[in-house]
Regions:
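Membrane-interface alpha helices of multi-pass inner-membrane proteins
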Residues: 108-131
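Primarily membrane-embedded glycan-assembly and transfer machineries that use lipid-linked glycans
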Residues: 1-109, 133-169
Length: 169
């Protein structure tokens, strides 16, 4: 796809247009770092609940292990590149991971993946997980949420949305 960011993404990040560039960068760096910390905490919690000890966990404790994991995540090439380009991929990854690891609630799985798909088209591939699981409610939630992001784009960006959906992709 030549352009994978739908109009909904522009709406979500519109507030950044009113901020000084350095403030926007600082917010993105803090958000990306928070996403790395949350990912690391999620990995730690998964290891705990599955009975798998992480290296150095005994010496570092919970906070130390999560801090080391966060550093490792942030040193990975894709994450470093995200800092350089100020991309939204950590936010998208956090939405997808949160959708699949959160406890079951009245809100079906798929909602957060649908929002992530509204920000960038590629996360929609995670709908295949719901399909393999035969989670029809989750698939319906994903599709409905994604369609809602498209509708919001058409309502609030009536010139740009048709251009994106009918020309850019």
């Amino acid at each position: 796809l030549p352009f994978t960011y739908p109009p909904f993404a522009a709406l979500v990040f519109l507030p950044f247009a009113f901020l000084p560039l350095e403030v926007g960068k600082a917010i993105m760096v803090l958000g990306t770092t928070a996403a790395a910390w949350w990912l690391s905490a999620t990995i730690y919690n998964y290891a705990q609940t599955s009975g798998r000890a992480l290296p150095l966990q005994g010496r570092l404790g919970r906070t130390g292990t999560i801090a080391v994991l966060t550093i490792v995540v942030m040193l990975c090439g894709p994450w470093r590149r995200t800092f350089h380009l100020m991309q939204i991929n950590p936010l998208i990854m956090a939405l997808i991971l949160a959708d699949f690891v959160r406890p079951a609630t009245r809100v079906p799985r798929g909602v957060l993946v649908g929002i992530a798909g509204g920000l960038k088209l590629t996360p929609l591939v995670f709908g295949l997980i719901l399909l393999v699981r035969r989670d029809w409610k989750g698939i319906a939630a994903l599709v409905a949420t994604f369609l809602a992001t498209i509708a919001i784009g058409f309502i609030l960006l009536p010139n740009e949305a048709p251009q994106f959906w009918f020309s850019a992709i």
